[in-house]
Amino acid sequence: MSLSPKHTTPFSVSDILSPIEETYKKFSGAMDGAPPGLGAPLGAAAAYRAPPPGPSSQAATVAGMQPSHAMAGHNAAAAAAAAAAAAAAAATYHMPPGVSQFPHGAMGSYCNGGLGNMGELPAYTDGMRGGAATGWYGANPDPRYSSISRFMGPSAGVNVAGMGSLTGIADAAKSLGPLHAAAAAAAPRRKRRVLFSQAQVYELERRFKQQKYLSAPEREHLASMIHLTPTQVKIWFQNHRYKMKRQAKDKAAQQLQQEGGLGPPPPPPPSPRRVAVPVLVKDGKPCQNGASTPTPGQAGPQPPAPTPAPELEELSPSPPALHGPGGGLAALDAAAGEYSGGVLGANLLYGRTW
């Protein structure tokens, strides 16, 4: 920054303060047209929001007036801006003049960081019954809601100061801790299980085989022998009787299940199928009739018998050599042998076709 007064820069003190002063003049003109009831609350708000002057601020004022003048101008501009914003909000929401929800003393203590006693804040119903309610809701309320006023007595307000009694609940809960511990200690506990020695169990089982029920003198005598109490002997005999009955019942059910599971023996598997086979050779000689000889006990289809040779001879003409002299019987025998050989060959070829 140049030190010459002819050449000024926009960073000088006068250049910085001149726009703020012009803005303050504009907002102060706007405040003149604002409702008269807003001046006092906003002035009080600017007063309690500004920090209280201390020794350091007084020393700074004595040291130089220009910094304090700049700060004063800044605070004034901020107050003017807040006043203009409040005036705009009042115009927007039609806030009547003179309406105040809280006293200035309580609000000042709240904004300074010290809330103090919550009892300083009035109850909601007190404000509703005051003159502020008339400003908010009008002078002539709806007659339909006139009966509601009897429910809005002083008891309807919340007593915030009395909320400190809740700390007594925590103290009472802490005091109940020893009581719970004492009740748990006084509760009856189950006695631990007593394990008998092998000698004691052996003697008890031996006596149980002899006698399943004992009288009182017998129990006392047996208990004194094995160093037990009569009650322990009595309980052992009861448990052992129940155990024996349960084992007998399970054994009977198992036997019935085994007997029912056996059932009748399964049928034997079916024998392999037997097929009739024709007998073509019997005792080293071929069968002339070609009939099959089934084995005993078999019932198979019988093949039809071939036509006898004489009938075939009658049907077929004989060769002329047979009709010659001296060749009658020999020719017939030769023809019969040839025909029988042909029949045997046919049986060999077609004997298994059915």
Curated annotation (Swiss-Prot):
S-S bridge residues: none
DNA-binding region: 189-248
UniProt keyword rRNA processing present: no
Keyword presence, DNA-binding: yes
Protein name: Homeobox protein Nkx-2.4
Ranges for region Disordered: 246-329
Subcellular localization: Nucleus
Start-end of Pro residues biased regions: 263-272
SMART domains: HOX
UniProt superkingdom: Eukaryota
Homology family: Belongs to the NK-2 homeobox family.
GO biological process: cell differentiation; regulation of transcription by RNA polymerase II
Swiss-Prot/TrEMBL keywords: Developmental protein, DNA-binding, Homeobox, Nucleus
Xref: SUPFAM superfamilies: Homeodomain-like
Cellular-component GO terms for this entry: chromatin; nucleus
Task performed by this protein: Probable transcription factor.
Molecular function via GO: DNA-binding transcription factor activity, RNA polymerase II-specific; RNA polymerase II cis-regulatory region sequence-specific DNA binding
PROSITE patterns, per database record: HOMEOBOX_1, HOMEOBOX_2
TM segment ranges: none
Main localization category: nucleus
